[in-house]
Amino acid sequence: MRLETCSLLCAGLLSAVPVSAQTAAPAMPQPATQAAPDATQPPRRVPEPAYRAVVPPSPGDLTVWPRGASPQEIGKALAEHFITQQAARFSGYPMVCTWYGALEFARLTHDDALRDRLIARFEPMLPGGAEADRMPKRHHVDDSIVGVVPLEIAIVTKGLPVYDPRYLQVGTSWADRQWAPPQPEFTFPEAVVPLNNLQGLSPESRFWVDDMYMLTMLQLEAYRATGDRKYLDRDAHEMVAYLDKLQQPNGLFFHAPDVKYFWGRGDGWFAAGMAEMLRTLPADHPDRARILQGYKLMMAALLKYQGADGMWRELIDHPEAWPESSSSAMFSFALITGVKHGWLDAETYAPAARRSWIAVTGYVDQNHDVTQVCTGTGKLDSMQYYLDRKRETGNLHGQAPVLWAAVALLRDEK
């Protein structure tokens, strides 16, 4: 049997009746001879194997993806775009979050060349380096997260010839400073809670929902790099305090106690922070049950508010709001991580995770920039303020979580 006929049979387009027994069809005009392909045009898409049409991936499959949506392809494109075009000058916590995602992608894909370029870009910012003055100085949660990059470098190079102890020293100094009394000349007053009210919390605690990624990741990375339990214990204690303060009965989080709106990216920061925390927190840790409870409550809420397009909105509980890519990528990361670890029921949550990843990749343009990203946003007690936020392309607030979601799909963990 000819291969073409077999393919059509598999696809259900021909019956299995022998050709001799079929009723003869009227002769059809033969197509004209095709011209040679134009070398100036992109190659025509090669059809996928017939079995893909017959046996498509299940709704919850997290391994087989449409053309152009694989985590390897998306992750590589965004990591390369970051190091070649977006990392020229340090620009704060969105850059740190993207750097972390790119380093993790390089580690998981064994891309040593990419890893070394990411490290080389940070090296001038070490003490005494040509760009050391670009390191932030404020005692503020949005600045202290810079310590994540040297800590991640220490983690991914541990035991390798390229390991440099300076990265661990610099990273842990930021993590230690986050719990030390603030230096007045380097303090951003709005972010610092009076020390006598802290009850073991960081002086940088301000009870904005965003903090639960910024603060969480610095302490987690310090623990991952050193194994020192103090970083993990105080981090988990902090997260429980934020859960008690900001999570609502519906599972979502207010931007701040005095701003009662469920802002997409704000909730995304918390979702991603909880997923990262639960990846590391031991099963017997006294705060794990409370954090897992808060995480599951939020994931259940996200199922309710996910749009038919796979996305979440700028204000999560307002379907009339615009689909926002950075929050959707963060929720995708949190869902993927929960399904792969078994914290979430795969039958219920994996389809939502798959839809969200495919939807988010559709917002990556031909230049590898993520589109429809909410601009940097402080808190304000106004619904219209959030609905009217500027939508940006290539903003690192969006590049970073798409990298995290790609990394989550590539991780082999449960």
Map each language-model feature to its residues.
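Extended ligand-binding clefts on enzyme/binding-domain cores
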Residues: V162, R166, R206-L315, A321-S332, ...
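CBM-like carbohydrate-recognition segments
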Residues: A36-V96, F105-G147, I153-V170, F186-P189, ...
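Aromatic-lined, polymer-binding surfaces characteristic
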Residues: P71, S91-A102, A106, H139-A154, ...
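Positively charged n-region of N-terminal signal peptides that target proteins for export
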Residues: M1-E4
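Bacterial N-terminal signal peptides
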Residues: C6-A16
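Boundary at the C-terminal end of the N-terminal hydrophobic targeting segment
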Residues: V19-T23, P29
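Glutamine-centric residue-chemistry signal
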Residues: Q22, Q86, P182-Q183, Q247, ...
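Extended ligand-binding groove/face enriched in aromatic
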Residues: R115-D116, M125-A256, N367
